[in-house]
Structure formats: C-alpha cells, structure tokens
C-alpha cells in the first residue's frame, strides 16, 4: 500500500473483517513482539502467504461476481449502495474498474438528487486518481467539490480524501519547498477531519498517527498506530496500511530489521486482502537486495511489477 495512507485505503469498509479474524490476526502480534529480532521468521510467513495469492484473489472475484449479478434487478438507492460496494472491492485492486464504478456512482447520485452521494462519488474518483498516480487530475477533481450543504459523514469523507491526496502528493514530489507545502495542506484537512471524529476512535487514531508521521513525529505516530493495531476488529486492509506506515518510520530511523518485519507483515495483509495498489513488497525487495538476498528480492520485485501493471498505476 502507498504510505497509505487507504487510508486511505482508508482506507474501505469492513468487507474483509471475517477473513481477518480467521487468518490475519497472528502476524501483528508476532511482529509487535519480535519485529527487531525475527525478520527471517516474518519473511518465511510472507513467502507462505504469497503461495496462497490465487486463493485470496479468487475469494475477491467471487464477491465481485455476486455483486454484479444483482445489478440488473437493483434500482434507486439500493443500486447506488451496490455500486458503492463494487467500487470498494475494486478501489485498491484495479484502477479502471474502480473508476468506472465511481463514475456510475456519480451518475446515480445525480439521478437521486443527493448532494451527499454526489460528494461521495467525487471523492471516490479522487481516490482512484491519486492511487493511480494521476495527482494533477486528482487535484482538479477535488477542487470543485462543494461540502457547504453536506451532512457530517460526507464532510468527514471529503476531509479524509483531501488529506490523503496532499499527503500522497508530498510523497510523490520529494522536492522542497513543495513537500512541506503539500504536507501542510494535508495537515489542515486532517485538523478539520479530527473535529468530526470521537477521540480515540479508530478513525481518530489513524488520522492522528498519519499526521504525526508526515511531520516525522515518529514516536507519537507509532503510539497511535499501535493502539489501532491492538483492536481485533480492524480489517486486513487497514492493518496493511498501518504496518506499512510503521515500517516506513523504522526505515527512516535506520532500524532495518524492524522495518523488514513490519513491511513483510504489511505485504501479508495486502495479500490476504487481495490488494494490488501497494508499495510494501517493492520497498521490502529493495531492503533485501541491499542485504544480498537476491533471490527473494527478485521475486518480490517481479510480483510488485505484476501488481502495479494489474492495478494500472501510472
């Protein structure tokens, strides 16, 4: 996942909650206890998980097929809800399909004369664009969104999306003074978002952790992230984002053993949730190459490129 921040896959509902409870809780405990001392153990678990990639993907495709089968006999608000489910299934899986369903959500929102649904559909389009690396188009799509008459949940969604866009833009730019400017913009949107979130809720912890991480307040960010990871109901996709973020902080602090373990854990969660829009595996490959693990590094690069090409990242 991107320093992903999505949240951003953010972030995406709890469709994978049952799967998480069955197969994805143990890595977080292993890594939390042994992240600095057992990277080999986590890499072995990652290799084992990757052998089941086709199985996890088939589960996603079955869910998608079941949703699509309902479309011909579904109308009005129920149809919008179905389009939303299809968008969420594709959001971090395949750009073209995700964007198509985001557009269909927008068309349905206009038919229903729903300002809230219109905002949600526009935010979905922004998420697709930023996930594909189309940042200019993402900003152009975000700017006209009018939340003046939106209800609180959809204002919240707007702030989540805007923060994610500018944080990702900062990661992509890597050049002064723009990095600081984009982080500051993302932080302003995060401050607005936090007003809508109950303190210590899942979303509050994630938003606070991400904001602290972007300002490189790593002790604070990891404190928030660890609290969130300790909650058993958190889905696999969100866990992938959080552990990827924590891996990045350890990498920045030159704690490579801990970074490898956390990134391996993130890659496991990405695999379990059939996420194709991801950076954990690629970053992990680079670290392993530097350590001389050429065979594993080469395989992770191959799979990372396969994921990126399938997703449609630019």
Over which residues does each language-model region extend?
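Bacterial N-terminal signal peptides
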Residues: 17-25
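A "functional boundary" signal
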Residues: 2, 7-8, 27-314
